[in-house]
UniProtKB/Swiss-Prot annotation:
Molecular function terms, GO-annotated: structural constituent of ribosome
Protein name (Swiss-Prot/TrEMBL): Small ribosomal subunit protein uS15c
Alphabetical UniProt keywords: Chloroplast, Plastid, Ribonucleoprotein, Ribosomal protein
Organism lineage: Eukaryota, Viridiplantae, Streptophyta, Embryophyta, Tracheophyta
A GO-annotated cellular component: ribosome
Keyword match Plastid: yes
Subcellular location, record wording: Plastid, Chloroplast
Source organism of this protein record: Lotus japonicus (Lotus corniculatus var. japonicus)
Gene from which the chain derives: rps15
Length: 90
């Protein structure tokens, strides 16, 4: 159900963005995170997938921090588009 809601956004992203761009990678990681989160509602003790989720969260966080340092405008636009929280500043 989560996968179907992102199909129009994916098609727009593929036309406009390079698959290697930071925005596209963050978008794909966010998709995976949402799919895994819905998976954990049924399979609470799937610890291997929980580890994978933590790894994906870390990768997305590193990409977002890179983007926020390089271009704040693109970072804010991406955060609003994906409806995710802004990272805390250390």
């Amino acid at each position: 159900m989560v996968k179907k809601s992102f199909i129009p956004v994916i098609s727009q992203e593929k036309k406009e963005e390079n698959p290697g761009s930071v925005e596209f990678q963050v978008f794909n990681f966010t998709n995976k995170i949402r799919r895994l989160t819905s998976h954990f509602e049924l399979h609470r003790k799937d610890y291997l997938s929980q580890r994978g989720l933590r790894k994906i969260l870390g990768k997305r966080q590193r990409l977002l921090s890179y983007l926020s340092k390089k271009n704040k405008i693109r970072y804010k636009k991406l955060i609003n588009l994906l409806d995710i929280r802004e990272s805390k500043i250390r």
